[in-house]
Amino acid sequence: VRLVGSEMCIRDSYSPAGTVLISPVALFPTESMARAVMAYLGAASIIGAIALASWMVSRRWFHIAFPLTVSFFFITPEPVQWTLALTNINGFMLLLEVLFVWLSLRLREKGVGWKGHFNRPEAWAAGIVAGIAVSIKPQFGVLFIVPLAFAQVAVVAVAALVSIVTFAIGWFTIAEPELFFTNLVPYLSEPRPRFNGSIGGLAIVHGWSDATVMALTVLTVVGTLAAVVTLWRWKEVDPVMFSFTAIAVCFAGGFMVSGLMQNYYAIWFIPFVLTVCRPRSPMHWPVTVLALLLTVANPLWPATGNATIDEMVTHMPGFMFMALPLIVATWGAVQIVKDRSEPEAVVEPESLRSN
């Protein structure tokens, strides 16, 4: 079974569950038609995700953030242009990310307790969305930071059920499902030197020592955990900002310590970028904006003639992914200190402001 773009063989690129979910693209009679459909649907998914995320951060369908965000991300080379050029699945995954957060926050608003969640359609819908996302790309397990924060056991249970069922269907229906364990898992466990901005990939390119790799890995993991800890109180103050920001830092940290980080993964930061519309957000810090600009504008940098500098600039997105959790952790710590020194500056919980 063949897919178009950069992921040429579904069976060799995904788990049995992911293969089942993506395989309908192979039903198109020609590759050119499949490419066109994937590109148009991918663009529609990205625009739809930005529209919904814009509404979530502003509570207005026609907020200026929507056209500005669409224009900016469709103009810059990374991440949208490459996503569409390669006709990969990442635009659809962005839509699943935003839908999941929207459904989870709607469930939170019901206030029925974790047992009552099992009777809510929002929990089932969120679980199905998460189950599909994790089945296609296991890295989307970071989405579960949201139901963890809001004690949404039902969402996790439904997602697990969907993942198990789709994996079982794939295992018994696709050819040679054992290749997932014999080929794909070993391949993903080893960082590759090309098109890989993860710590492992950068280490191969720059010849870093094992000690350097270990130090950067520990720093990234600690920074990601610190970011989540300092953000935790915002889950009640501003659940939208908390959810999009926590997912972004978990994505950034997770990709850097895993075996693969590609620049167009920054597409899943777009909801975080939109939190600039919230009363308080790490996106209000110029250093955060600079880090994200260096991520998306990297391919535009001209060559300097210095091999070392050019190599570092080429891999700038990887360094920015590594820096993002540390930046957010610092922002969160500063907000804690500020609120303790200026009690009147503390923002009331969103639930109180709406009453």
PLM regions and their residue ranges:
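Primarily membrane-embedded glycan-assembly and transfer machineries that use lipid-linked glycans
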Residues: 1-2, 6-7, 11-124, 153-270, ...
